[in-house]
Design a protein with these regions (language model features):
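Short, low-complexity Pro/Thr/Gly
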Residues: 1-528
Length: 528
């Protein structure tokens, strides 16, 4: 009956059919092989240094590229007794997302010409917009955003498991008195890393070398390590911890090996690639509520992404001074783009007042405490957290050790911070409004909802000229090369710039360009 119930409208659906659901079809691909090969840097890669990797010609194409870096162990031997500082041990944590924070900037150059430059800050923002929920847990482990690395250590916690600590608990959930030596894998986001059709044709670049230059941040901007957690004033910096070096650092490149015919064509024929670049003209310091940010961009841009970060969020020096808010919150907050500090610190004691002391996790190395117990008072650290901040741990009941672990893991990507510093924003092109003035929430809620995979953290603002800016296929651009004067007008919240408070505005733009490869050399078709 269904088959014979056929009318004029069905012609639009099944007339002159082009496919069938009942016989699978597929397309044959060219033969190839892929292998990931380690590449070394020229010189010692360490905190605060710039190193270069010359990409060797191991294969025909270069595809996905990862930074592999091993963080040093930070343990209780890295503290010296100082009565004036009331030293009680080494309390340390890597700042959030250490793999991304470690990268100040990374750039790729071909034949001495810089083709693209990206930043750890941008990599964090991009993943906030594009990373799927299924990939989030694995990606966080790759870049070290785990409780093992970013939660505060304590001398009363269990030792790090290893050959010399046979009595240490094997469970990764047990709180530790040290930050373990850990290898991170940070995927780079260059155009050739994200799309196999844009893989870099090394076989066609016989006369031009491909180099990747990496600038690493100083350890002071990656680590929080103090001698005690209840100091009222003065420096409590655990100096020895800040003298550590990276254990190892290298790049892993996925090389593609082509079959004979395709390899010959790839080497002999000229190529044009539509590539994506990142533009960033540097931080702009602001101290008033109304600001005009000049956009010195070029080329057809897919979208604008901007953040406004209060300087108080990233005061690395203040975080090591007793009595300061960032000291009570255990370190600077480089990926906090809101107008207030994140008052949910990365420490077990934020969830259980008994965490700082001898409890079942430390004594038995297992979660034996099945229930919560009453607390008559709070520990020194819990009291200090509550001082002047939106956390009150001075009364109430603790939770079990297992509960503390579950809360810590759950809260790893949660935040108790402020609002979007951008109250309103407007883009002007050659003096004309590109759109009417909008509230800041439109740019960190509605625009990401329309154009991106994921809703980002508060304060990551987006305006997209494309329908699908995450895709390589162009779906809309604005050619900033043809615009003489582009201005982003921002009105900032009082919490961001009240009194003498200042902030940094960072505006990023993703654009298209053309990479031409011919006669063994490569270069951009359009310069700035």
């Amino acid at each position: 009956m269904q088959l014979v119930a056929y009318g004029a409208q069905d012609v639009y659906l099944t007339g002159n059919p082009q496919i069938t659901f009942w016989k699978v079809t597929y397309r044959r691909h060219t033969n190839y092989a892929m292998e990931s090969i380690e590449q070394t840097f020229n010189g010692q890669a360490d905190f605060g240094r710039r190193v270069t990797c010359t990409v060797s010609r191991n294969g025909d194409l270069a595809f996905r590229t990862y930074l592999q870096v091993t963080l040093p162990e930070i343990n209780q031997s890295m503290v010296t007794t100082d009565d004036e500082k009331n030293t009680t041990g080494c309390f340390a944590r890597w700042l959030d997302c250490p793999g991304e924070q470690l990268i100040s900037q990374v750039e790729v150059e071909i034949g001495g010409q810089r083709i693209d430059r990206q930043y750890g800050d941008w990599m964090h923002i991009w993943n906030q917009l594009t990373l799927t929920s299924e990939q989030e847990v694995g990606y966080n482990k790759m870049i070290g955003n785990t409780t093992q690395l970013t939660y505060l250590t304590d001398p009363s916690y269990a030792a790090v498991d290893g050959p010399c600590e046979s009595s240490a608990p094997k469970q990764v959930c047990a709180p530790r008195n040290a930050l373990p030596e850990t290898t991170l894998y940070v995927p780079l986001q260059f155009w050739f890393c994200r799309n196999p059709g844009l893989a870099l044709p090394l076989i066609a670049l016989q006369y031009h070398e491909v180099k990747i230059n990496l600038d690493l941040r100083p350890i002071d901007e990656c680590l929080f390590a103090v001698n005690n957690t209840n100091s009222g004033s003065g420096s409590v910096k655990a100096t020895t911890a800040y003298n550590q070096s990276l254990v190892a650092a290298s790049l892993y490149v996925d090389y593609i090996f082509l079959d004979t015919d395709e390899r010959r064509r790839m080497a002999q024929n000229p190529h044009e690639y539509l590539i994506e670049q990142l533009q960033f003209t540097g931080d702009e310091s602001v101290g008033s509520s109304s600001n005009k940010i000049k956009l010195n961009f070029n080329h057809p841009c897919k979208e604008l992404v901007w953040v406004v970060q209060p300087d108080a969020n990233v005061d690395y020096c203040a975080s090591l001074e007793g009595g300061q808010d960032l000291y009570h919150l255990f370190g600077a907050q480089p990926f906090n783009y809101s107008d207030a500090l994140d008052s949910l610190p990365n420490a077990l004691l934020a969830f259980s007042a008994s965490a700082r002391g001898a409890d079942n996790v430390i004594n038995s190395n297992l979660f034996d405490d099945a229930g919560a117990g009453a607390v008559d008072g709070a520990t020194d650290e819990a009291t200090n957290i509550g001082a002047g901040l939106a956390v009150d741990a001075t009364s109430g009941s603790t939770v079990s050790d297992a509960g503390s672990f579950v809360l810590a893991e759950t809260a790893l990507t949660m935040h108790c911070w402020g609002e979007n510093p951008v109250v309103t924003a407007k883009l002007q092109l050659n003096g004309q409004d590109r759109f009417s003035e909008r509230e800041g929430t439109y740019f960190d809620l509605v625009q990401p909802f329309q154009h991106h995979t994921r809703h980002p953290d508060t304060g990551i603002n987006v305006y997209s000229f494309a329908l699908r800016p995450e895709e390589h296929q162009p779906s809309g651009t604005c050619n900033f090369s043809r615009i003489d004067n582009a201005t982003l007008q921002l009105v900032l919240s009082n919490a961001t710039v009240s009194g003498t408070a200042t902030a940094k505005v960072r505006v990023y733009a993703t654009n298209y360009n053309v990479l031409r490869v011919m006669s063994g050399m490569g270069g951009l078709a359009y310069s700035n």
